[in-house]
Regions:
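A sequence/structural signal for flexible, mid-protein segments enriched
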Residues: 1-224
Length: 224
């Protein structure tokens, strides 16, 4: 098993987009090969605060436990993120890219609207396990253009015990996972743009007398 060193820090830079990085080192120079995964969780608010609800044909107050103004959402890494220091004198990883939060969509911009968190998991690999993940990355992520590498044969340390001639694909490795979490509040990135009303759901204004009849025909409350 590979003993994975602790993560030194997770940092970020924000010229326009927000780029996140991981930093680590092994003072014994024995790890050398690394893989990272991450889980994102962010808090955001709905544009309108719904203090009322429509139940059984009546408009009623929404109790605190049913508030829908504060929301949370999570996402996880999908791409294979690898690093190695085999060509370096010291086993030090600095500014290894993790992910980038862009301003291109409301989904991305919402991540930093209130508070954002990222949990980074780090795993030390053997050279053989690193080669497996590196080939898998090339075969699955770096394809589709004339200049991409050709798919390679996958290494494997799995064998079929009932049929030794049958090829098996996969790689088993054992190691310790180290992890670290950071939080970023919107106040730390004050220039980050927030959504405006034109990018949210439209508002319908009416008097309280007409509201029950309108909601009675709304597909959200009265699905067909």
């Amino acid at each position: 098993a590979v003993l994975t060193p602790e993560i030194d820090s997770i940092t970020w830079k924000q010229p326009d987009e927000l780029n996140l990085f991981v930093h680590t080192h092994d003072a014994s120079n024995s790890t050398r090969y690394y893989r990272w995964e991450y889980e994102e969780t962010w808090e955001y608010n709905s544009w309108f605060e719904a203090t009322l609800d429509f139940k059984d044909g009546q408009i009623v107050s929404r109790p605190p436990e049913e508030q829908v103004f504060t929301c949370w959402r999570s996402d996880s890494s999908e791409l294979i993120n690898l690093g190695n220091t085999s060509a370096l004198t010291q086993d030090v990883i600095s500014y290894q890219p993790l992910t980038t939060i862009t301003q291109a969509s409301s989904f991305e911009r919402n991540k930093l609207s209130v508070r954002y968190s990222i949990l980074v998991k780090q795993l030390g690999l053997t050279k053989e396990a690193y080669n497996f993940w590196n080939i898998l990355k090339k075969n699955t992520e770096l394809t589709g253009t004339l200049f991409d590498p050709q798919p390679s044969r996958m290494p494997s340390n799995i064998k079929c015990t009932t049929d030794p001639g049958r090829e098996s694909i996969g790689f088993i490795s054992v190691g310790k996972i180290t992890q670290q979490r950071i939080f970023i509040r919107h106040s730390a990135v004050p220039s980050w743009p927030l959504l405006d009303e034109s990018q949210t759901c439209s508002k319908v204004t009416m008097n309280s007398i007409d509201a029950p009849a309108y909601l009675q025909n709304d597909p959200f409350y009265s699905p067909v």
